[in-house]
A protein has these predicted regions:
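P-loop NTPase motor module signature
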Residues: 1-4, 8-159
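A short, hydrophobic C-terminal helix/tail in secreted or cell-surface proteins
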Residues: 158-167
Length: 167
């Protein structure tokens, strides 16, 4: 949903990070289907050893490590209009470095939109972190969604396979 909201009024690429390669590919496929475009055209992805995006792509999904690597040759991430860091609660080293980098980049790129998403993140803490230094706290936007029922099973409910007496 956030990706589609960002397409309006954009003047550059939307970069969306995912913590895992499979997630980046899967989400890219889904977004391309939702928009009605072939994967690799308007919506692309890049993971280690695989780049299915074009210069004309509007949305690029990638692992957080790929975006972090891009900062080495494009310090201001100039081709991006919006950066979405998804699953920020994963708190990997790459995500933590990326969030720190984006915080220091924002004063130099006030036009850059940064969106951090998570189902379980401490909203107030991140809002204060991205504000601070004389700036107001970053805005918090809550997007409600579907919740899925969770069934809890214990080992008692799972039948144990028959084991041979000797191996």
């Amino acid at each position: 949903r956030q990706r589609q909201m960002c397409i309006r009024d954009m003047h550059g690429l939307i970069g969306l990070t995912q913590p895992r390669r499979l997630a980046a590919r899967s989400v890219a496929t889904r977004v391309a289907e939702e928009i009605g475009t072939p994967l690799g055209e308007l919506v692309g992805y890049q993971v280690r050893f695989e780049d299915q995006s074009k210069d004309s792509s509007l949305i690029k999904l990638m692992t957080d490590g790929i975006l972090l690597a891009e900062t080495q040759h494009d310090r201001y991430l100039e081709k991006y209009d919006t950066i979405i860091v998804d699953e920020a609660h994963e708190r990997s080293l790459n995500i933590d470095f990326l969030l720190g980098y984006l915080k220091t980049l924002l004063p130099r790129r006030p036009d850059l939109k940064v969106i951090i998403t998570s189902a379980t993140i401490d909203l107030e803490r991140f809002s204060k972190h991205f504000g601070g230094d004389g700036l107001p706290d970053a805005p918090i936007v809550e997007v409600s969604g579907r919740t899925y029922p969770v069934e809890t099973l214990s080992l008692i409910h799972i039948s144990e396979p028959t084991r041979p007496e000797r191996i």
